[in-house]
Amino acid sequence: MIPQALLFVPLLIPSLCLGKFPIYTIPDKLGPWSPIDIHHLSCPNNLVVEDEGCTSLSGFSYMELKVGYISAMKVNGFTCTGVVTEAETYTNFVGYVTTTFKRKHFRPMPDACRAAHDWKIAGDPRYEDSLQNPYPDYHWLRTVKTTKESLVIISPSVADLDPYDKSLHSRVFPSGKCLGITVSSTYCPTNHDYTIWMPVEARLGTSCDIFTNSRGKKASKGGRTCGFVDERGLYKSLKGACKLKLCGVPGLRLMNGTWVSIQTSDDIKWCPPDQLVNLHDFHSDEIEHLVVEELIKKREGCLDALESIMTTKSVSFRRLSHLRKLVPGFGKAYTIFNNTLMEADAHYKSVRTWNEVIPSKGCLKVGGRCHPPVNGVFFNGIILGPDGNVLIPEMQSSLLQQHMELLESSVIPLMHPLADPSTVFKDGDEAEDFVEVHLPDVHKQVSDVDLGLPSWGKYLLMSAGALATLILAIFLITCCRRANRTKSTQRGHRESGGKVSVAPQNGKIISSWELYKSESETGM
């Protein structure tokens, strides 16, 4: 039953070139018809590995996505904000103390932030102490500033990891996106100038636990790898594959949307940005199992039809429809012309809509043109009805289309949410509502003598002091001059002595002040 199961993935591969699932296969090239015997009929071999000529199988190990892998990978992290709490204390002349608390920010260092986070997670008692405001100090007639630098740790802060480019997405990032954590850059900037985001685990690889190791068989021909048989026995071709990294792991995105870490020496181009990877979930596996069962039934139906032909020695158009090749590639086409069994080499292609096969009434499109019927008969059981319509006896199971629709709707999305900076604090005052300080570093500054006056009061006081000093200087200078004048007068009197004479009184000359005084007293 394994060969029948191998039909599944090859059936999907060509259809995904167009991004759709095939509902039918029709020859795009049809060789000349030649009569054959009934014993030459055979069920088609739908193994792509044989179509490509890759018959050399060798065991190898590869990685693929885990079953049940969820596209939204969450990365636990935390935010770290640098906060400076300042206590300003002033003691006035009478000893009254006034304390004012202020909060500012600074840019934190990533290493210090991770150490602070470890303190908080470990429940270190120093963390509780760091939640307090700095203890204010005071000095008489002086302003004392006491500051404490703290690292605010807010956790958890969860970001989404994009596996395609390892970018991180969160509303706290500028434009909603961070290009990821690398060896040289261990943090992401945020909408707040003094806040950074860091993952709890330094290595993002721990968040990319989406792979599983598997073993399969690599199919090659002459050193060229054509495809491989996976762990479940399904063959997957490398035709149309492109290079794609998931979480930094190099691999290939196959045309059916699956991803494997297979390495090949062939020159394969990188995938364009719109090439996504299909999820590998339980629902997909369940439908895949139903599809495989359906394909096995078709294989069994082909063998039953062939057995009936061999037993009854008769062929009908309906039975020939079972011999049609179900996957694109080289095969055979059968028909009956004039009661003669005919065979032709054909190359089948997949079609998505019936309009590709029957573009107009009575037209069966083969190789870009309407194929002419012979007596109302085309090939592979396709005939022209009495009303002129083309009648195709079979079509693919609806389960196949259901499976492809599931794959197309379940892809790993590229997440580009729009960041709303207004939802994140921008001003320093808003940060006080949710900060939790950490790692205190207390500093104290003592100012010069301060009378507690405002700036204009200080200038007024200085002007008054200068004016008082000027008045005092003038007063002192004036006093000094008067004292000097008195001293000089007295010194002159002492130097003149008895030589001093006065105007005569009553015709007498008074020789001295003492004589004048004595005479005055005698006269009295």
UniProtKB/Swiss-Prot annotation:
Keywords attached to this entry: Disulfide bond, Glycoprotein, Lipoprotein, Membrane, Palmitate, Signal, Transmembrane, Transmembrane helix, Viral envelope protein, Virion
PTM text: Glycosylated and palmitoylated by host. Glycosylation is crucial for glycoprotein export at the cell surface.
The keyword Cytoplasm is annotated on this UniProt entry: no
Topology in membrane: Single-pass type I membrane protein
Use in biotechnology or industry: Primary surface antigen capable of inducing and reacting with virus-neutralizing antibodies. Almost all human and veterinary vaccines are based on the functional aspects of the G protein.
Regions crossing the membrane: 460-480
GO cellular component, one term: virion membrane
Compartmental location: Virion membrane
Intravirion side: 481-524
Residues carrying sugar: 256, 338
Gene Ontology biological-process annotations: entry receptor-mediated virion attachment to host cell; fusion of virus membrane with host endosome membrane
Top-level lineage group: Viruses
Signal peptide start and end residues: 1-19
Virion surface side: 20-459
Similarity comment: Belongs to the lyssavirus glycoprotein family.
Function: Attaches the virus to host cellular receptor, inducing endocytosis of the virion by using different host proteins including TFRC, GRM2 and ITGB1. In the endosome, the acidic pH induces conformational changes in the glycoprotein trimer, which trigger fusion between virus and cell membrane. There is convincing in vitro evidence that the muscular form of the nicotinic acetylcholine receptor (nAChR), the neuronal cell adhesion molecule (NCAM), and the p75 neurotrophin receptor (p75NTR) bind glycoprotein and thereby facilitate rabies virus entry into cells.
Miscellaneous field: Arg-352 is highly involved in rabies virus pathogenicity. Its mutation dramatically attenuates the virus.
Subunit relationships: Homotrimer. Interacts with matrix protein. Interacts with host TRFC. Interacts with host BST2; this interaction inhibits viral budding by tethering new virions to the cell surface. Interacts with ITGB1. Interacts with host GRM2.
Protein name: Glycoprotein
